[in-house]
């Protein structure tokens, strides 16, 4: 049994986007928490207004939440009691390498190298096709005492920031990480489940974004709820196949970070990935959608997921179809027809 952690932790959330802000708000309701924003003007405005007007407009943040644009100050908050601290990385996949590289230089100097650390991003790094844990390992793996994991699950940041109920999974081989996240966030509105399957949790979080784009395209084409249900179910099969090839536990894909996150992202009105798909299905070009300011991790990581799957000889027909529509000029309806024309086969592989 893991050792119980104290009732109070010092928490630093690095990254003041919507998700980082939401988690910082949740943690600050029970623990001394600092939210680091790279943009000084944003940090100053958030501290003055107790609101992230850029990413979560209209959501009041707890008065106890501290906001700083000084990374050294945010980390110094932990250095007062490093044995009872937690670092949450709230940056997207694209921001992981630069932030982890900076932490590799700063944490040991402050005696924080063994502080439990979790990341919250979902996706594959575009240039390398790495999952987040591989990025963390590359940047921080040589740091003595590293205890790291991933926090994920079906969640929209706005609802979490508002204090509405949510269930999340923390996955790590380190009991210290699992315990720290549970202590920091588990409470009246947040339920935390623990796992050791980092790869499974990450694969689910990455591929569900791509499948959600496909579901949005389906809805944009007005193909009906039957078609969307088929995409969700067969998309889950793609996630499980990919995960199996990387050593993930299959039961993970039936849980919060697999089926749960997929259903939410593929059907929720707040899903950016689904919204991009809706626009594509309605006939808009990807370049125009992105130029309007709409972003989605499913677009960013689709090619990386496809390329890594090809290298591993994993069949991902829905992911391949999404890439063909987004990047190769294939019409959405032609992609649907190609998926429907695939050879009939058993739903589950024969043992």
Swiss-Prot record:
Keywords: Cytoplasm, Lipid biosynthesis, Lipid metabolism, NAD, NADP, Nucleotide-binding, Oxidoreductase, Phospholipid biosynthesis, Phospholipid metabolism
Subcellular location: Cytoplasm
Superkingdom of origin organism: Bacteria
SUPFAM superfamilies tied to this protein: 6-phosphogluconate dehydrogenase C-terminal domain-like, NAD(P)-binding Rossmann-fold domains
Enzyme Commission designation: 1.1.1.94
GO biological process terms, semicolon-separated: carbohydrate metabolic process; glycerol-3-phosphate biosynthetic process; glycerol-3-phosphate catabolic process; glycerophospholipid metabolic process; phospholipid biosynthetic process
Keyword Secreted: no
Pfam families: NAD_Gly3P_dh_C (PF07479), NAD_Gly3P_dh_N (PF01210)
Binding site for sn-glycerol 3-phosphate: 122, 153, 155, 208, 261, 271-273
Catalytic reaction(s) noted: sn-glycerol 3-phosphate + NAD(+) = dihydroxyacetone phosphate + NADH + H(+); sn-glycerol 3-phosphate + NADP(+) = dihydroxyacetone phosphate + NADPH + H(+)
NCBIfam families: PRK00094.1-2, PRK00094.1-4
Described function: Catalyzes the reduction of the glycolytic intermediate dihydroxyacetone phosphate (DHAP) to sn-glycerol 3-phosphate (G3P), the key precursor for phospholipid synthesis.
Record's protein name: Glycerol-3-phosphate dehydrogenase [NAD(P)+]
């Amino acid at each position: 049994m893991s050792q119980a952690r104290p009732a109070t932790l010092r928490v630093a959330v690095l990254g003041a986007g919507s998700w980082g802000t939401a988690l910082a708000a949740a943690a600050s309701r029970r623990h001394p928490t600092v939210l680091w924003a790279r943009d000084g003007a944003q940090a100053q405005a958030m501290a003055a207004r107790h609101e992230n007007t850029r990413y979560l407009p209209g959501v009041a943040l707890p008065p106890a939440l501290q906001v700083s644009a000084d990374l050294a100050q945010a980390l110094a908050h932990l250095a007062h009691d490093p044995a009872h601290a937690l670092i949450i990385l709230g940056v997207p996949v694209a921001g992981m390498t630069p932030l982890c590289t900076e932490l590799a230089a700063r944490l040991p100097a402050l005696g924080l190298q063994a502080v439990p650390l979790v990341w919250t991003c979902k996706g594959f790094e575009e240039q390398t096709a790495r999952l987040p844990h591989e990025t963390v390992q590359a940047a921080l793996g040589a740091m003595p005492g590293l205890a790291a994991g991933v926090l994920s699950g079906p969640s929209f940041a706005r609802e979490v920031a508002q204090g509405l109920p949510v269930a999340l999974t923390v996955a790590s081989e380190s009991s210290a990480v699992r315990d720290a996240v549970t202590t920091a966030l588990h409470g009246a509105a947040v339920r935390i489940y623990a796992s050791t399957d980092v790869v499974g949790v990450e694969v689910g979080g990455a591929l569900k974004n791509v499948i959600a784009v496909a579901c949005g395209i389906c809805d944009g084409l007005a193909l009906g709820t039957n078609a969307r249900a088929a995409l969700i179910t067969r998309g889950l099969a793609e996630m499980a196949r990919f995960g199996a090839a990387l050593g993930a536990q299959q039961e993970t894909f039936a849980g919060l970070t697999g089926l749960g996150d997929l259903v939410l992202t593929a059907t929720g009105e707040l899903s950016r990935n689904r919204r991009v798909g809706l626009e594509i299905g309605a006939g808009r070009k990807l370049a125009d959608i992105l130029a309007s300011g709409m972003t989605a991790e499913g677009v960013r990581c689709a090619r990386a997921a496809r390329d890594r799957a090809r290298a591993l000889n994993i069949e991902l027909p829905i992911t391949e179809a999404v890439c063909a529509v987004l990047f190769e000029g294939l019409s959405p309806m032609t992609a649907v027809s190609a998926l429907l024309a695939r050879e009939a086969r058993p739903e589950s592989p024969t043992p």
